[in-house]
Amino acid sequence: MKKKVTPYAGSKASKKAQVTQMFDAISGEYDFLNRIISLGIDIRWRKKLIQMAQKNKVEAALDIATGTGDLAVALTRTSAQRIVGLDISPGMLALGKEKVEKRGFQNTIEMVLGDSEALAFEDNTFDLVTVAFGVRNFENLEKGLAEIFRVIKPKGTLLVLETSVPTRFPFKQFYGFYAGWLMPRMARLLSKDRSAYDYLAESAVHFPYGSAFNNILSKIGFIRVANHPQTFGVASIYCGTKPTT
């Protein structure tokens, strides 16, 4: 990132600990606020990611930073026979487990508590790894991506959905107003944790999006790296493949 952004500026805790605390605090309101703040467009972005995933032969899939499980549930529309949803926040994960059970996917989806930078899986375990709005919360971005690379099978795919910043007028100017001023104020009216959405907005701005993130993926070892901007560049879907050697 351009600079280290943490949820609680005055805290001496690690970013990882702060992120866990933040998501535990907002877990009960996360889905509702996410729909309002994104104007529901995040649903369309996830559908696009799933369409990309469906082009691959997938037996085992891992959804990192699964949160309340939206993307893990959506992955049932791929060929995956085994889906693991992993999150560092017990509060978010508890809601995700409820969602999985309510939809009857408990035999397909396993929800586990875990750290994306220290994955408890063997090398070359998953055909597909997905991360939606999670990589910018990694304490060490390259370490987390290297762990993902390790657990993906050769020829396996990484798909990352993350916020980005539009570069063209007038979308860049509107995004600056929306993310920097309007979104935090909307969240403060509705959220118990006022600083959480300040952090989410600021971390989006400072995330190395576009070609900068492509370069990091290539550095880690991924090939056929590409990014696909969504909705005028407000978000991007990144893809990369693990080579056979």
Task: Give the location of each predicted region.
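N-terminal auxiliary segments of SAM/dcSAM-dependent transferases
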Residues: 1-20
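C-terminal alpha-helical "lid/dimerization" subdomain adjacent to the S-adenosyl-L-methionine
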Residues: 17-18, 88, 161-216, 220, ...
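Conserved alpha-helix/loop element of class I SAM-dependent methyltransferases that forms part
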Residues: 29-32, 38-59, 74
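Hydrophobic beta-strand segment of the Class I
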Residues: 30, 129-130
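Class I SAM-dependent methyltransferase SAM/SAH-binding core
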Residues: 60-118
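A short acidic, Gly/Pro-enriched loop at the edge of an enzyme's catalytic core
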Residues: 117-128
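A short glycine-rich, Lys/Arg-flanked "PGG" loop and its adjoining helix->strand segment in the class I
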Residues: 142-157
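Core SAM-dependent methyltransferase catalytic element
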Residues: 220-245
